Amino acid sequence: MSSYTAAPLKFPRSLRIIKSADYGVLVHTRNENTFRLTSKYFSINAMKFPEEPGRLRFGITVGKRNAHRSVDRALVKRTLREAARKQAPNLAALLGEQGVGLDVSLRLRVPLKEIPGIDQGVNALKLSLRTDARSLMEALLKRFPKQLAQTRGE
């Protein structure tokens, strides 16, 4: 047996949006501090908080309309959590430099049955979801400094 112990892959409570009221504000507010990003399968609603520098929280929702079975919803949530967890350190560093906080809502925007790979087995589906989630999080990371520059009038 190897003595190697993997670091726990956690998504701590401090990184999560917990209250439904916070989700409501994030999804329904439209102003200069909010923006949206979409990919093939997922969408992001994000809101900047200039008064809370360095704060980063993620909320993940997968509706029954898009993924009927609970096992499928859990798979999509795990995939989104993994993508968010991997980009969180980079995004948190960027937020710290820029002096703002950010709340991000991630959600599945298309029915799972429309995703290529659903009929080829769970591994193909996981690959499709993982690839799209990763590209969406990278787009968030790339776009965020541009959003700040536009807000500040630079």
Whereabouts are the PLM-identified features?
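Positively charged, solvent-exposed patches that mediate nucleic-acid binding
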Residues: 1-154
